Structure formats: C-alpha cells, structure tokens
A protein has these predicted regions:
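An amphipathic, aromatic/His-enriched active-site/gating alpha helix that lines ligand/cofactor pockets
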Residues: 20, 24, 28-36, 55-89
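N-terminal first-folded block
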Residues: 2-36, 40
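Short acidic, gly/pro-rich beta-turn/loop elements at beta-sheet edges
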Residues: 16-18, 50, 62, 98
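Short, well-ordered beta-strand segments in beta-rich or mixed alpha/beta enzyme
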Residues: 2-9, 39-66
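Glycine-rich beta-strand-turn "strand-cap" elements at beta-sheet edges
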Residues: 2, 40-48, 74-99
Length: 99
C-alpha cells in the first residue's frame, strides 16, 4: 500500500476556495480505481493549513491518479492560492496489525 501525506497553507483571503477545491478533489479521487482512502483535515494548530491523508492500493494506482488532468489542475490551483509551497510525501507501507 502507498500512503500519501500532503499539506497546503492557504492565504487568509483564499481559505474558503482552497477548502472547496480540496473537498471536490478528495471526493473525486475516492472514485478512482485503487483509492483505498482519501481525506482532508484542518490542522488544529493552524486553521489555514489543510492536511491530506491518502491510501492507494499500489504505486500504479497512485501514478494513474497523478496523471488525471483534474488532479494536475487541482495542484496548480492550490499553488496559486497558497501562502507557502504545498507538500507531498509518499510512503510504502505494510499494515502490521489492526488494533
């Protein structure tokens, strides 16, 4: 399984638009083949920062997600509305145990 974490810190004047675009992106992404989960959360320590957590069945599914034009458009839109650079980190994960 591939785990993706990401974040964006919106400008104060663009937070509502960043939140709207992020929710649309998450909902669309959940319908893609290989998407196990996809969520966005508001950071409790910085209310302008959104944090993304995604799980993908495998790297091929994630690469297909990155190739979707709407995904590329989403990233470009966020970058234009962000206070600082967006972050994306990928992890290759194996579930050890569900507690």
């Amino acid at each position: 399984m591939i785990v993706v974490t990401g974040s964006v810190t919106a400008r104060a004047d663009s937070f509502d638009e960043v939140r709207k675009l992020s929710l649309e992106h998450v909902r669309r992404s959940r319908t893609e083949p290989g998407c196990v989960s996809h969520a966005v959360h508001v950071d409790c320590e910085n209310s302008l920062r959104l944090v993304f957590f995604e799980q993908w069945a495998d790297r091929a599914a994630l690469l297909a997600h990155f190739a979707v034009p709407a995904s590329r458009d989403f990233v470009r839109s966020l970058q234009a509305l962000a206070e600082s650079a967006t972050t994306i980190e990928l992890y290759d994960a194996t579930r050890v145990e569900k507690l």
